[in-house]
């Protein structure tokens, strides 16, 4: 398949190039009667702008800008199509959940150490939400985390509240 495509591209290139089918200089071709009135020498330049002085080749466009704009639009359309596809979104969600589970596992190992305090957690760049997940607290408790009555029933809740206030204080300082 690729050989056929390559052969097709090469043949189109040979037909389109300006010198592919030019007549040899000084050939003896007969002109028809209608062409005799407007006859030009065979070896004359055949370009539309042949009489103009040559300019900077970088200034000439020759259709490449249109092709480049079409290609950019096509690439942008494909990018949005791919990013909006359900497969890519599900893969991103799966990757995010796996990284979150890994991070929560690291925090759980950190919590099992004896000398864990809010400074150690902050130095390890633990976010309060990650700590909440690592402590395996009920999500409803997040609303009443500042109540000392709730701390008695949930021992990890007081640690979460202390760290959340410390984290808020440290992030507002920076």
UniProtKB/Swiss-Prot annotation:
Motif (RxLR-dEER): 46-62
UniProt function note: Secreted effector that activates ROS-mediated cell death in plant host and is essential for virulence. Plays a role in the transition from the biotrophic to necrotrophic stage. Associates with and promotes the degradation of Nicotiana benthamiana BPA1, BPL1, BPL2, and BPL4 to disrupt ACD11 stabilization in a 26S proteasome-dependent manner.
Induction: Expression is induced at 9-18 hours post-infiltration (hpi).
GO cellular component entries: extracellular region; host cell plasma membrane; membrane
Signal peptide start and end residues: 1-20
Region (Disordered): 82-99
Phenotype upon gene inactivation: Exhibits significantly reduced virulence with smaller lesions on Nicotiana benthamiana infected leaves.
Subcellular location field: Secreted; Host cell membrane
Family: Belongs to the RxLR effector family.
Name of the protein in its database record: RxLR effector protein 207
Result of changing residue 94 to F: Leads to the transition from disordered structure to ordered structure and abolishes the function in cell death activation
Organism encoding this protein: Phytophthora capsici
Subunit structure and binding partners: Interacts with Nicotiana benthamiana ACD11, BPA1 (binding partner of ACD11), as well as BPA-like proteins BPL1, BPL2, BPL3 and BPL4.
């Amino acid at each position: 398949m690729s050989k056929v495509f390559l052969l097709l591209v090469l043949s189109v290139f040979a037909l389109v190039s300006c010198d592919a089918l030019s007549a040899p200089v000084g050939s003896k071709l007969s002109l028809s009667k209608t062409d005799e009135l407007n006859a030009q020498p065979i070896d004359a330049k055949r370009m539309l702008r042949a009489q103009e002085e040559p300019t900077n080749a970088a200034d000439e466009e020759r259709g490449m800008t249109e092709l480049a704009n079409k290609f950019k639009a096509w690439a942008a359309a494909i990018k949005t199509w791919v990013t909006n596809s359900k497969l890519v979104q599900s893969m991103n969600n799966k990757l995010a959940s796996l990284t979150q589970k890994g991070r929560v596992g690291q925090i759980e190992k950190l919590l099992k150490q004896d000398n864990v305090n809010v400074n150690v957690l902050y130095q390890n760049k633990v976010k309060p939400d990650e700590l909440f997940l690592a402590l395996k607290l009920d999500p409803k408790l997040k609303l009443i985390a500042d109540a000392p009555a709730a701390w008695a029933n949930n021992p990890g809740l007081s640690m979460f509240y202390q760290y959340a206030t410390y984290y808020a204080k440290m992030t507002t300082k920076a």
